[in-house]
Amino acid sequence: MSSDEGETPKMGFGHAMLLKMGWKGKGLGVEEDGRTEIIVNKKKQDKVGVGASISDRVSTSNNWESTNEAYDHILAKLNGVDEITWKKKNNKFVKEEKITFKRTIKKNSKKNKDESDSDSDSDSESESDKKPTKKQKVQSDSDSSCSDSSSSSSSSSSESEKEDKSSSNTTSDESDKESSSDSSDSSESENEKKDKKKIVNNKKGKDSDSSSSSDDSCSSESDSSSSSSSSSSSSDSSSESDSDNKNKNKNKNKNKKSKESDSSSSSSSSESEEEEKKEVAKKSFSVSKTRYQRLLRAKSVKNYSEDDLREILGYRPNQDTRKLKTKE
């Protein structure tokens, strides 16, 4: 409202500053009749704080008990003591503790279930891994038993055949075994065998001259069941000479085969060596693929030959006498 001319309006610091800046004391609006008075808002707590009167302030400043009570009340509000007392009255603390305890129990039970499930899964996986191994072991055992049975049957058949063979066949088998075991020293073994056979023939010739019934029985026991006890000394000597000739022919054939196998193995080894040499030659670095940057990155030049380095770096007649380091 506009101030009357007879009354002196209450002027404050703000009004004085506005008048100095050119304000004429008029209000807002079209007719300029807006309020120009200062609006003061008093707080509800008149005894304490900014809105308190002077008398209240004086009384409280001297009364320390009231100030301490007010201070404690403010601290209680800030710390939430009133809420704590209210919860205790209504027994809400106990309920919340029970709820939190139940939640923790549920979480722990879920964790235990998850762990048990994971353990069961791992156990099942381990069992599934173990099962095929057991099957394989059973199969391998069955295969081994089959092989053992087949080997036993073959051994029994071979033993029966050996029993039926004559002494000439046994001697030939022994000579064959000796020749196969001594294939590497064939020349020496042949000479020794010939000497032994000559000695045996001489002994048998002497025994044939002084043959008797007892000698015939001993010779029949040493020979197989197929050889007859009534065979004469001449027939024995002829059969032995025939067996000796056969053994010699067999030994010769085996020696030839061993020599051929040795020659073939030597030729194959020489061919393999030639192929290795060719492969080594192929591994040499081609100059078209190499670059100068690879030489700069390389820690040593030993990977390249002298010719490769000259082709990469270019021919330099002034530095031709210099020897480059190559592979050792």
Curated annotation (Swiss-Prot):
Disulfide bridge positions per record: none
Superkingdom as given in the UniProt entry: Eukaryota
Compositional bias per record (Basic residues), positions renumbered to this chain: 101-110, 248-257
Extent of Acidic residues compositional bias: 116-126
GO cellular component annotations of the record: nucleolus
Composition bias type Low complexity, residue spans: 141-158, 210-240
A molecular function (GO) term: nucleic acid binding
Region described as Disordered: 97-291
PROSITE patterns associated with the record: G_PATCH
G-patch domain mapped to chain residues: 10-55
Record-given protein name: Uncharacterized G-patch domain protein DDB_G0278987
